[in-house]
Amino acid sequence: MRNLFKTATIYILIALVILLLVDIFSGGLSYNQFFSNLSERREVIYSELINDINDGKVTRIVLSYNNVSGQYADGTKFDNVFVPSPDKFLDQIQPAIQAKKIQIVTKEPPQVPWWLSTFLPMLIFAGLMIFVWIFMLQQTQGGGSKIMSFTKSRAKTIQDLKKKVTFADVAGADEEKEELKEVIDFLKNPRKYIELGARIPKGILLVGPPGTGKTLLAKAVAGEAGVPFFSISGSDFVEMFVGVGAARVRDLFDQAKRNAPCVVFIDEIDAVGRHRGAGLGGGHDEREQTLNQLLVEMDGFGTNEGIIVMAATNRPDILDPALLRPGRFDRQIVVNVPDAKAREEILKVHARNKPLGEDVDLSQIAKITAGFTGADLENLLNEAALLAARKGKRQINMEEVQEAVAKVLMGPEKRSRVYTEKEKKLTAYHEAGHAIVRTMIPDSEPVHEVSIIPRGYAGGYTMYLPKEDKFYASKSDMMREIVTLLGGRVAEKLVLEDVSTGAASDIKRATKIARDMVTKYGMSDKLGPMTFGTEQEEVFLGRDLALARNYSEEVAAEIDREIKSIIEEAYKKAEEILKQNIDKLHKVANALLEKEKLTGEEFRKLVFEDAQPQLV
């Protein structure tokens, strides 16, 4: 900072000297005038000067175009009196001239050299721009020696083996780790593969939803192999300057070659590897130029250099085909959402440094967190730890974990929100309707928790405990879900003889499931196993998806009738269930009004304490 201030001071002084020289050469201030300003001066206005000259008070004047200076009889000097018109001025002091009371000296204004008036302004402007440019670079990059460093790669290098990440830190991804073991072996023993003529994959693309551990897997590969790990984001290549992205790609691979064997990891590669357009506008953008350089670099080095390029994306469908061909990213590893067993292993990893109570059952937590990614599970245990700390506890109990699950899924509780008794009663019957309908349908997941405490945008919620992870949904599963979603609306109608907007989200989800059954999964008996509507990939828009209708108006009307039929059938089924179990509906709703929240065991005790309920 001190050197920066010193440099700026020098530039400012140089600029001031240049401005002073320009002023001197342009006649604004002569050398003699500059030093004569030290003597006594008198301020005179134009009209007063005319009168003083004609009265004989002025003995000498010097006329230089529109500027008059001179001396009074008492020796007082004046200068820089502006004269609007020199000819008119001479006419006005003609009496004094004729009486020879005054000495007049006429001077031509100093002429500025043509080269000075032409080139000096340009030099000053250029110098000012250079100064501003250097100043900005010093501010952003910390020194004048880094003026051209924006073409350097911004990859972060991880070489500290004491803090390395290994496969022990990556739980629930056994198949993915198995795929990467040969990559690790190649990094450790490349000669074995080279002698056999084997070619290790040059590029490995990790594909999966956000938070599934793609970046963590890449770090584990570098940690297990004990080699340098270069990490960079796809967006770091593209800058405001043309050609910077391609230069950074070249610099990144130059660094990798100097540190081989190593791993180069490009996170969110879809930012730079997006499908190239069709050349609209007669050219290509900076991102495509960067992608072209990346394609060349990946196909330009041999296996004996020991460089493994890994990348991660959650949008493999928009990547350029040239990037996915053999010889570049020729192996794709899908890192999917973990199943129940994998979730339990992930929870064990994240619970290492957390004091868990004896009542915490990680296997049960894994069951109720279907669809959670590794990042979600880590956040879940962190929220549980924060809740325990807020309560002043020294360990995390199952109560905090279950509260954290609901918080992550639907948001924090909003106990301060004020509801009228009518709204509270409506919410209680709505949630009780969901829970009872779900319980009375055969082969349904058991209820885990029912609450009328607001969370997020919801006035209440009903959670279920999945028996097992499902990778496919049958027609009966989807119908069961629609019946459950409509249970809240049916309960409102049966008991309160009115409906509310609280079921809007349920109806929207039920309608979407019914539409997918008809148009996407071919589950309609009338229309048969057909799909309706196509997804168009517009290459001109960078492979953005657009839905196109490929069926007639008659088919569209039939689709609407089928969707309506499914919804009406589910509504009647939910209505039948609740009418047969109306006493249990009242009992659960009253318990919710009293306690606000029921666990799964409390709910089942209320429902099953009498005779066996009617299953529909």
Swiss-Prot record:
GO terms for cellular component: plasma membrane. The active site is at 431. The chain crosses the membrane at residues 9-29, 115-135. Its cofactor is Zn(2+). Keywords: ATP-binding, Cell membrane, Hydrolase, Membrane, Metal-binding, Metalloprotease, Nucleotide-binding, Protease, Transmembrane, Transmembrane helix, Zinc. It holds the Pfam family FtsH_ext. Residues 30-114 are extracellular. SMART domains: AAA (SM00382). InterPro entries: AAA+_ATPase, AAA_lid_3, ATPase_AAA_core, ATPase_AAA_CS, FtsH, P-loop_NTPase, Pept_M41_FtsH_extracell, Peptidase_M41. It is found in: Cell membrane. Binds 1 zinc ion per subunit. Disulfide bonds: none annotated. GO terms for molecular function: ATP binding; ATP hydrolysis activity; ATP-dependent peptidase activity; metalloendopeptidase activity; zinc ion binding. ATP binds at residues 208-215. Residues 1-8, 136-616 are cytoplasmic. It is a multi-pass membrane protein. The keyword Transferase does not apply. One of its GO terms (biological process) is protein catabolic process. The keyword S-adenosyl-L-methionine does not apply. Its EC number is 3.4.24.-. Zn(2+) binds at residues 430, 434, 506. PANTHER family: ATP-DEPENDENT ZINC METALLOPROTEASE FTSH 1, CHLOROPLASTIC-RELATED (PTHR23076:SF113), METALLOPROTEASE M41 FTSH (PTHR23076). Acts as a processive, ATP-dependent zinc metallopeptidase for both cytoplasmic and membrane proteins. Plays a role in the quality control of integral membrane proteins. In the central section; belongs to the AAA ATPase family. In the C-terminal section; belongs to the peptidase M41 family. This is ATP-dependent zinc metalloprotease FtsH. It comes from Caldicellulosiruptor bescii (strain ATCC BAA-1888 / DSM 6725 / KCTC 15123 / Z-1320). The gene is ftsH.
